Amino acid sequence: MASSAPRGLRSDHVVTVGIALFSMLFGAGNLIIPPLLALQAGTATPLAMIGFLIAAIGLPVMGFIAVALAGTARELASRVHPKFGEFFVAAVYLAIGPCLAIPRTSSTAFEMLVPLLPEGVSLGTARLVFAVAFFVVAFALTLRPGVITRVLGRITGPALIALIVLVVGAAVISPLGPAAAPQAPYDAGAAVQGFLTGYQTMDLLASLAFGIIIAETIHELGVTDDKRVAFEISRSGVIAGVLMAIIYCGLALAGMQLGTVMPDATNGAAILARSASMHFGLAGTVVVFVIFFLACMNVCIGLISCCSRYFCETYVVEGGAEASEEAMRRPFAILAFVFAAFSCVLSNVGLDVILMFSVPMLNALYPVAIVLVLMGLVHGFCDAHPQVWVWVGGVVAVQSVITSVRDAFFAGAWLPFDALPLADIGAAWAPVAVVAFVIGLAHSQFVAHSRS
């Protein structure tokens, strides 16, 4: 008797999960980076966007696939060493969670509300009230994991897409101006600078974390075979990636048209707000606020949920991921409340302070995430040469942390890494990874030869 093929998702479920994934990834940073990139890149925008799309979409989609193949982000990173996996994944969750990304969602949404506030209103009081209300809603939705996909995939996700299409469509139909000449640093090496700018979305790190929620959702929809789950995650990731690519290009077009109107702009949010107000007046300002609110709320819900579940399964509940939902419910709710409350407090220090800490943290984590994902995609070869994991993961982590600490606290100090190729564009980790890979191969062969 022929065995039946593993059950997969229906097409409409794949689309729903893909849109939910898009909603989890597409936050404030995704909205504000492309317009600023295009305004500064000007006529070099096509080249800059190629690099940006590779980093902001290609790497996260590869991240989803690599995690699906490995099982979890921790299992992927633990190929370097179990302790390394534990520490690295915890750092990723803290970075994309309560220490940076979660408080940034509330702060960014509030910044877009400020132009709509009545004159004389205390910004400090308004920020506090908004943050409390924002995180109360996010916390309430987080406690209903089954609702997350339905809300993000069927309501707020499509609404967000529709509003962005409205703003971008206006820019396409009624251009505001021609592209300006490229500004530094896009006037030299636009594609490379676009790639580095793609770091700021943090979506590669998010892809390592959100796999937990997406995998659970796919299980709930009836897919139980592990290989099939990985395949469905890949399909959903492609859908999310295509949606993001289309919207990124549209947002870039809107920003590129304002290069001569506001050449000194330093904030993508201001660029979008200006574009919308020039097309729609006050209604445009309201639309932009709603766009930012939906994007930030979507991401906040996903981040609180995945961070709470990870730390709950890893450090709190006995049995970890194998524990029953009943055993998980109370600890999960407590952690979700703690993360939401902490993020609420941190968000009140203001967006500028939060963003000040983002660059060194991302520069320390991103190179490690990139090499882990790339090795995860060819895990069969790397698993056959296990020392490759140790050398590449360990050496790149050391190099990235040292460089990030130098950049944050000792700017201008010279390091030996500065003499390496690509160091001038912040990618000294790449040649370091190549050398470590070769050493890891040689080490693996030496160990295998010694045993034989």
Please tell me what each predicted stretch does.
Residues R10-L21, P46, K83-I96, L128-V132, ...:
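Select transmembrane alpha-helical segments in multipass membrane proteins
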Residues T16-F26, L31, A170-G177, P185-A254, ...:
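Hydrophobic, membrane-embedded alpha-helices of multi-pass small-molecule transporters
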Residues L37, S107-A126, H219-E220, C300-F337:
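Helix-loop-helix connectors at the membrane interface of multi-pass transporters/channels
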Residues A68-E75, F134-T156, E220-V223, A341-M356, ...:
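Membrane-water interface regions at transmembrane-helix termini and the short interhelical loops
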Residues A73-S78, I247-M297, V359-L362:
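TM-loop-TM module centered on a large, flexible mid-protein loop between adjacent transmembrane helices
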Residues L141-A171, S358-I370, W389-V398:
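Membrane-interface loop-to-helix entry segments
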Residues R144-I155, A191-G194, I214-L243, T260-A273, ...:
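Hydrophobic, small-residue-rich membrane helices and short re-entrant helix-turn-helix hairpins
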Residues I370-V438, H449-S452:
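C-terminal membrane-solvent junction of multi-pass transporters and transport-like membrane proteins
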